[in-house]
Swiss-Prot record:
Red blood cells. Residues 2-142 form the Globin domain. InterPro entries: Globin, Globin-like_sf, Globin/Proto, Hemoglobin_a-typ, Hemoglobin_oxygen_transport, Hemoglobin_pi. It comes from the Eukaryota. Pfam families: Globin. The modification Phosphotyrosine is found at residue 25. Involved in oxygen transport from the lung to the various peripheral tissues. GO terms for molecular function: haptoglobin binding; heme binding; iron ion binding; organic acid binding; oxygen binding; oxygen carrier activity; peroxidase activity. This is Hemoglobin subunit alpha.
């Protein structure tokens, strides 16, 4: 999915507002995903999935950091996310549908924390961006 210049501007502006909360938002999105889509828990049998657990917070930070890297490299998502794509495809073998589920939970989390900034245009841009990230992450599955 091609991001327009307006989409890139919207994504960067939204991510700037996330600021130092990327890890917290990542953890919150993971918690939402585990509660809303319980089958996603199967990839984390060794985690304490309770609210506020250190393991969920730690993985949330990884999610937030990866998205921050993707925002910084929007013009080369395949290059920026290649190692992460390899990890999820070859080692972790995550079902590709889970990226869509997490993307949805991230959108909900961002909308909850920044309701005034979450306009239809920003929502659409973030959705396109997260779909692009998901596409790159599943590209090694073929």
């Amino acid at each position: 999915m091609v991001l327009s210049p307006a989409d890139k501007t919207n994504v960067k502006a939204a991510w700037d507002k996330v600021g130092g909360h990327a890890g917290d938002y990542g953890a919150e999105a993971l918690e939402r995903m585990f509660l809303s889509f319980p089958t996603t828990k199967t990839y984390f049998p060794h985690f304490d999935l309770s609210h506020g657990s250190a393991q969920v917070k730690g993985h949330g930070k990884k999610v937030g950091d990866a998205l921050g890297n993707a925002v910084a490299h929007m013009d080369d998502l395949p290059g920026a996310l290649s190692a992460l794509s390899d990890l999820h495809a070859y080692k972790l073998r995550v079902d590709p549908v889970n990226f869509k589920l997490l993307s949805h939970c991230l959108l909900v989390t961002l909308a909850c924390h920044h309701p005034g900034d979450f306009t239809p245009a920003v929502h659409a841009s973030l959705d396109k961006f997260l779909a692009s990230v998901s596409t790159v992450l599943v590209s090694k599955y073929r």
